[in-house]
């Protein structure tokens, strides 16, 4: 599985997921800096107020 792993508005980068991980995620939230976006492998739990999208195809979390 290959997922994007860049933060917010950085240039696109990818990572190859290890350990049999078969999903990618994109988390979005707002704070005093504005909208923050985090991407990576897996499908982590999130706290209230954080939007999470999980998907199961290569590079699906842009």
From Swiss-Prot:
<feature type="disulfide bond">
    <location>
        <begin position="3"/>
        <end position="24"/>
    </location>
</feature>
<dbReference type="Pfam" id="PF21947">
    <property type="entry name" value="Toxin_cobra-type"/>
</dbReference>
<protein>
    <recommendedName>
        <fullName>Short neurotoxin 2</fullName>
    </recommendedName>
</protein>
<dbReference type="InterPro" id="IPR054131">
    <property type="entry name" value="Toxin_cobra-type"/>
</dbReference>
<dbReference type="GO" id="GO:0099106">
    <property type="term" value="F:ion channel regulator activity"/>
</dbReference>
<keyword id="KW-0872">Ion channel impairing toxin</keyword>
<feature type="disulfide bond">
    <location>
        <begin position="17"/>
        <end position="41"/>
    </location>
</feature>
<dbReference type="GO" id="GO:0005576">
    <property type="term" value="C:extracellular region"/>
</dbReference>
<dbReference type="InterPro" id="IPR018354">
    <property type="entry name" value="Snake_toxin_con_site"/>
</dbReference>
<dbReference type="InterPro" id="IPR045860">
    <property type="entry name" value="Snake_toxin-like_sf"/>
</dbReference>
<keyword id="KW-0629">Postsynaptic neurotoxin</keyword>
<keyword id="KW-0800">Toxin</keyword>
<dbReference type="GO" id="GO:0030550">
    <property type="term" value="F:acetylcholine receptor inhibitor activity"/>
</dbReference>
<keyword id="KW-0964">Secreted</keyword>
<comment type="similarity">
    <text>Belongs to the three-finger toxin family. Short-chain subfamily. Type I alpha-neurotoxin sub-subfamily.</text>
</comment>
<dbReference type="GO" id="GO:0090729">
    <property type="term" value="F:toxin activity"/>
</dbReference>
<feature type="region of interest" description="Disordered">
    <location>
        <begin position="1"/>
        <end position="20"/>
    </location>
</feature>
<keyword id="KW-0008">Acetylcholine receptor inhibiting toxin</keyword>
<feature type="disulfide bond">
    <location>
        <begin position="43"/>
        <end position="54"/>
    </location>
</feature>
<keyword id="KW-1015">Disulfide bond</keyword>
<keyword id="KW-0528">Neurotoxin</keyword>
<feature type="disulfide bond">
    <location>
        <begin position="55"/>
        <end position="60"/>
    </location>
</feature>
<comment type="function">
    <text>Binds to muscle nicotinic acetylcholine receptor (nAChR) and inhibit acetylcholine from binding to the receptor, thereby impairing neuromuscular transmission.</text>
</comment>
<dbReference type="InterPro" id="IPR003571">
    <property type="entry name" value="Snake_3FTx"/>
</dbReference>
């Amino acid at each position: 599985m290959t997922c994007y792993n860049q933060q917010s508005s950085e240039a696109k980068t990818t990572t190859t997921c290890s350990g049999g991980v078969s999903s990618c995620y994109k988390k979005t939230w707002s704070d005093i800096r504005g909208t923050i976006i985090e991407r990576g492998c897996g499908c982590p739990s999130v706290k209230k107020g954080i939007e999470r999208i999980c998907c199961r195809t290569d590079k699906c979390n842009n």
